[in-house]
């Protein structure tokens, strides 16, 4: 079985971003500037933001984190996002999700300048992704595609099953896998909590992308020999260990290629965030042919 090593691929992508940043500083006189908004004390969000801050330092970005009290009002949060969107000094904006109860994430995301939407969640970027126009792509699905590209695992003409229909992973993942591109062109099925006989659907798949957050949901009997599995799930077991949505240890002699958890998709999410921020920096200076 081929181990799809997200740590290795992410490290190479971060190095390319660092090289790009060095060139951009020489050309324009400053590095990309990423603004991160963290609301509340969610432990997982705190960890993710620290990882992102460290990655920014490694590639040479300027980053600033706005740490806001969980009791902040909707109007105050929207005011900050609007100010950052209009600032000439900010190239990318990341609103760390989830937000505390009482705050409307969709309203906030819609206020981010689409050209600075490095998470790819703004409705304009989502719409452009759906019709194949240049856009900033959601980081985790984009990271999955980057892994497939690196290892030459093309889903073109194959059956792909995405398990989960979230706006962050499932839906954009399905769009990227079915897109008319070298590492798209798959026939995609999206499964969710109302899908009858999930095992039967997954068993037909050549590419399996679980992103639902249920430990070891995908078992040996659900996977046909030779399938490629990219596990987006991240779950903490009672003993403190992390695992994905796939029963990894019992599938190594069934799958032809598979990501580990941790060390698979997670590092790619942060690396593609860095890549998106460089893209946003460039687009603010020279928009693509179909500008955002």
From Swiss-Prot:
<comment type="similarity">
    <text>Belongs to the tetrahydrofolate dehydrogenase/cyclohydrolase family.</text>
</comment>
<keyword id="KW-0486">Methionine biosynthesis</keyword>
<keyword id="KW-0378">Hydrolase</keyword>
<dbReference type="InterPro" id="IPR020630">
    <property type="entry name" value="THF_DH/CycHdrlase_cat_dom"/>
</dbReference>
<dbReference type="GO" id="GO:0009086">
    <property type="term" value="P:methionine biosynthetic process"/>
</dbReference>
<dbReference type="GO" id="GO:0035999">
    <property type="term" value="P:tetrahydrofolate interconversion"/>
</dbReference>
<comment type="subunit">
    <text>Homodimer.</text>
</comment>
<keyword id="KW-0521">NADP</keyword>
<dbReference type="GO" id="GO:0005829">
    <property type="term" value="C:cytosol"/>
</dbReference>
<keyword id="KW-0368">Histidine biosynthesis</keyword>
<dbReference type="InterPro" id="IPR020631">
    <property type="entry name" value="THF_DH/CycHdrlase_NAD-bd_dom"/>
</dbReference>
<dbReference type="InterPro" id="IPR020867">
    <property type="entry name" value="THF_DH/CycHdrlase_CS"/>
</dbReference>
<comment type="pathway">
    <text>One-carbon metabolism; tetrahydrofolate interconversion.</text>
</comment>
<keyword id="KW-0028">Amino-acid biosynthesis</keyword>
<dbReference type="Pfam" id="PF00763">
    <property type="entry name" value="THF_DHG_CYH"/>
</dbReference>
<dbReference type="GO" id="GO:0004488">
    <property type="term" value="F:methylenetetrahydrofolate dehydrogenase (NADP+) activity"/>
</dbReference>
<keyword id="KW-0560">Oxidoreductase</keyword>
<dbReference type="Pfam" id="PF02882">
    <property type="entry name" value="THF_DHG_CYH_C"/>
</dbReference>
<dbReference type="GO" id="GO:0000105">
    <property type="term" value="P:L-histidine biosynthetic process"/>
</dbReference>
<keyword id="KW-0554">One-carbon metabolism</keyword>
<comment type="function">
    <text>Catalyzes the oxidation of 5,10-methylenetetrahydrofolate to 5,10-methenyltetrahydrofolate and then the hydrolysis of 5,10-methenyltetrahydrofolate to 10-formyltetrahydrofolate.</text>
</comment>
<feature type="binding site">
    <location>
        <begin position="164"/>
        <end position="166"/>
    </location>
    <ligand>
        <name>NADP(+)</name>
    </ligand>
</feature>
<dbReference type="InterPro" id="IPR000672">
    <property type="entry name" value="THF_DH/CycHdrlase"/>
</dbReference>
<keyword id="KW-0658">Purine biosynthesis</keyword>
<dbReference type="GO" id="GO:0006164">
    <property type="term" value="P:purine nucleotide biosynthetic process"/>
</dbReference>
<dbReference type="InterPro" id="IPR046346">
    <property type="entry name" value="Aminoacid_DH-like_N_sf"/>
</dbReference>
<dbReference type="GO" id="GO:0004477">
    <property type="term" value="F:methenyltetrahydrofolate cyclohydrolase activity"/>
</dbReference>
<feature type="binding site">
    <location>
        <position position="193"/>
    </location>
    <ligand>
        <name>NADP(+)</name>
    </ligand>
</feature>
<dbReference type="InterPro" id="IPR036291">
    <property type="entry name" value="NAD(P)-bd_dom_sf"/>
</dbReference>
<keyword id="KW-0511">Multifunctional enzyme</keyword>
<protein>
    <recommendedName>
        <fullName>Bifunctional protein FolD</fullName>
        <ecNumber>1.5.1.5</ecNumber>
        <ecNumber>3.5.4.9</ecNumber>
    </recommendedName>
</protein>
């Amino acid at each position: 079985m081929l181990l799809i090593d997200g740590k290795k691929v992410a490290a190479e992508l971060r190095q390319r971003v660092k090289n790009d940043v060095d060139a951009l500083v020489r050309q324009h006189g400053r590095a990309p500037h990423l603004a991160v908004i963290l609301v509340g004390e969610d432990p997982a969000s705190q960890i993710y933001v620290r990882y992102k801050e460290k990655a920014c330092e490694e590639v040479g970005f300027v980053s600033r984190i706005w740490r806001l009290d969980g009791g902040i009002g909707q109007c105050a949060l929207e005011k900050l996002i609007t100010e950052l969107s209009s600032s000439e000094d900010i190239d990318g904006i990341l609103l760390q999700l989830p937000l505390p109860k009482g705050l409307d994430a969709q309203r906030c995301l819609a206020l981010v300048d689409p050209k600075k939407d490095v998470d790819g969640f703004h409705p304009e970027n989502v719409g452009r992704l759906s019709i194949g126009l240049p856009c900033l792509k959601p980081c985790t699905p984009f990271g999955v595609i980057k892994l497939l590209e690196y290892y030459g695992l093309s889903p073109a003409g194959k059956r792909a099953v995405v398990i989960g229909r979230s706006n962050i992973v499932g839906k954009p993942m399905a769009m990227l896998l079915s897109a008319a591109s070298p590492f798209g062109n798959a026939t995609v099925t999206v499964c969710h909590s109302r899908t009858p006989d999930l095992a039967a659907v997954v068993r037909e798949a050549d590419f399996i992308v679980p992103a639902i957050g249920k430990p070891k949901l995908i078992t040996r009997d659900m996977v046909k020999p030779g399938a490629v599995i990219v596990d987006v799930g991240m779950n903490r077991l009672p003993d403190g260990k992390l695992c994905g949505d796939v029963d990894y240890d019992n599938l190594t002699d069934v799958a032809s290629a598979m990501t580990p958890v941790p060390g698979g998709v997670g590092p790619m999410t942060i690396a593609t965030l860095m890549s998106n921020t460089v893209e946003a920096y460039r687009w603010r200076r020279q928009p693509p042919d179909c500008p955002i």
